[in-house]
Swiss-Prot record:
Database matches in NCBIfam families: NDH_I_N, PRK02504.1
MF GO annotations: NADH dehydrogenase (ubiquinone) activity; quinone binding
Localization (cell): Plastid, Chloroplast thylakoid membrane
Signal peptide: none
Protein function: NDH shuttles electrons from NAD(P)H:plastoquinone, via FMN and iron-sulfur (Fe-S) centers, to quinones in the photosynthetic chain and possibly in a chloroplast respiratory chain. The immediate electron acceptor for the enzyme in this species is believed to be plastoquinone. Couples the redox reaction to proton translocation, and thus conserves the redox energy in a proton gradient.
Summary of subunit composition and partner proteins: NDH is composed of at least 16 different subunits, 5 of which are encoded in the nucleus.
Domain of life per record: Eukaryota
Catalyzed chemical reaction(s): a plastoquinone + NADH + (n+1) H(+)(in) = a plastoquinol + NAD(+) + n H(+)(out); a plastoquinone + NADPH + (n+1) H(+)(in) = a plastoquinol + NADP(+) + n H(+)(out)
EC category: translocase
Family, similarity comment: Belongs to the complex I subunit 2 family.
Native species: Liriodendron tulipifera (Tuliptree)
One CC-aspect GO term: chloroplast thylakoid membrane
The protein's name in its UniProt record: NAD(P)H-quinone oxidoreductase subunit 2 A, chloroplastic
Length: 510
């Protein structure tokens, strides 16, 4: 009898929850239509996997890619609509949020074809991989549109949990297990620090959780210049710093890059930074509006440390993935310049433009690492010596992406950095921009060193790995080459196409 009553209560509670969710989607579903497409894609993946055999594997890739493309299309159709706040103030849709969501979807769309051959060769579980990628993408999109402190905390946890699982996907690999453990421990600690910072904001604002209402609450309570706000700023900066991985919050990055499967590293290296940058701009610009001098100083210190340490340590690396890990630390220092500049001198527009180019440059480089690693089983920089003699396409595309990362003209990376540094210079960040220019020169050195190795070999000799290198037929690795071609084209956009890109980015103001 007791069991029967409990069962009825469970059914009633479940029905109420379902009806509440249906009501929210019915009246607010249009606000999160791109996210709903991904949710539908996730459900479809689970249904097909549970009812099909190995012959339907291509359908899994097709459904995942189609869901992402349809979500991008839905975002583009919604472009230039009036800003809207939905779900009782928890979620906001505007051009600024949507362009970051577009960047995250673009990353995921490029990463799936990049992963196909790797998954087949390593015999990884395909469905789970695609589910984690789509779920992480969904979490990143919700983080971009988050409008209150609770959603800002929960959304990155959705992204982070999938990231931990993806990082440890090759369970038999000791390095992967070590990387996942470090990633999980650091991620858990940073989440605790972040929520502690939000608790200080919550108390200081009189119990408000929405970003704009926190500002109004701080004015009412006269706490906007209190020590509690400074404490909240420090804790939140440290918490967000883990996601952005600037120095000195970068300790996990090289180990995770080296130990995780290469397609996973490619995915995490761009999506996490895009989502965290979107969140950081809103958090610093709105709740900490009255503490702009303080958070500007904090971010300047992080940017300087990141640009110097990231680029200097990258010179000493022998692993290609570890080198890109430290390179990404330096790159996030450049992005932070745009966050500091803000709206006043097109800082956000320059940051968005540079991140768009960074996605193509970085994913193009990782596509080369995936392709070479599958043929040789190594990612040691010295083992790339003389690759041009065996695979000219791979060597040339790698060279273009690396040169663009270094910021050499007339490639896209040069114009992205130029606009970013110019906006910083106009905002009076002379020292920060000078450090950025100097460290960019340092980065060119280690990129050119790799390119020289690719083209001429070490002492005019090729390594045994390259000597035994066998390029697969086009039909077997066309997915990686497709991603690489798209990324190379995007990395070599001439300066003439910068103006429309910057104009679109300038429409993303709050």
């Amino acid at each position: 009898m007791i069991w029967h009553v409990q069962n009825e209560n469970f059914i009633l509670d479940s029905t109420r929850i379902f009806m509440k969710a249906f009501h929210l989607l019915l009246f607010h579903g249009s606000f999160i239509f791109p996210e709903c497409i991904l949710i539908f894609g996730l459900i479809l993946l689970l249904m097909i996997d549970s009812t099909s055999d190995q012959k339907d594997i291509p359908w899994l890739y097709f459904i995942s890619s189609t869901s992402l493309v349809m979500s991008i299309t839905a975002l583009l159709f919604r472009w230039r609509e009036e800003p809207m706040i939905s779900f009782s103030g928890n979620f906001q849709t505007n051009n600024f949020n949507e362009i970051f969501q577009f960047l995250i979807l673009l990353c995921s769309t490029l990463c799936i074809p990049l992963s196909v051959e790797y998954i087949e060769c390593t015999e990884m579980a395909i469905t789970e991989f695609l589910l984690f990628v789509l779920t992480a993408t969904l979490g990143g999109m919700f983080l971009c549109g988050a409008n209150d402190s609770i959603t800002i905390f929960v959304a990155p946890e959705c992204f982070s949990l999938c990231s931990y699982l993806l990082s440890g996907y090759t369970k038999r690999d000791v390095r992967s297990n070590e990387a996942t453990t470090k990633y999980l421990l650091m991620g858990g600690a940073s989440s605790s620090i972040l929520v502690h910072g939000f608790s200080w904001l919550y108390g200081s604002s009189g119990g408000e959780i929405e970003l704009q209402e926190i500002v109004n609450g701080l004015i009412k309570t006269q706490m906007y210049n209190s020590p509690g706000i400074s404490i909240a700023l420090i804790f939140i900066t440290v918490g967000i710093g883990f996601k952005l991985s600037p120095a000195p919050s970068h300790q996990w990055t090289p180990d995770v890059y080296e130990g995780s499967p290469t397609p996973v590293v490619a995915f995490l290296s761009v999506t996490s930074k895009v989502a965290a940058s979107a969140s950081a701009t809103r958090i610093f610009d709105i709740p900490f509006y009255f503490s702009s001098n303080e958070w500007h100083l904090l971010l300047e210190i992080l940017a300087i440390l990141s640009m110097i340490l990231g680029n200097l340590i990258a010179i000493t690396q022998t692993s290609m993935k570890r080198m890109l890990a430290y390179s990404s630390i330096g790159q996030i220092g450049y992005v932070i310049i745009g966050i500091i500049v803000g709206d006043s001198n097109d800082g956000y527009a320059s940051m968005i433009t540079y991140m768009l180019f960074y996605i193509s440059m970085n994913l193009g480089t990782f596509a080369r690492i995936v392709s070479f690693g599958l043929r040789t089983g190594t990612d040691n920089i010295r083992d790339y010596a003389g690759l041009y003699t065996k695979d000219p396409f791979l060597a040339l595309s790698s060279a273009l992406c690396l040169l663009s990362l270094g910021g050499l003209p007339p490639l896209a990376g040069f114009f992205g950095k130029l606009h970013l540094f110019w906006c910083g210079w106009q905002a009076g960040l002379y020292f920060l921009v000078s450090i950025g220019l100097l460290t960019s020169v340092v980065s060119i050195y280690y990129y050119l060193k790799i390119i020289k190795l690719l083209m001429t070999g070490r002492n005019q000799e090729i390594t045994p790995h390259v000597r035994n290198y066998r390029r697969s037929p086009l039909r077997s690795n066309n997915s990686i080459e497709l991603s690489m071609i798209v990324c190379v084209i995007a990395s070599t956009i001439p300066g003439i196409s910068m103006n429309p890109i910057i104009a679109i980015a300038q429409d993303t103001l709050f």
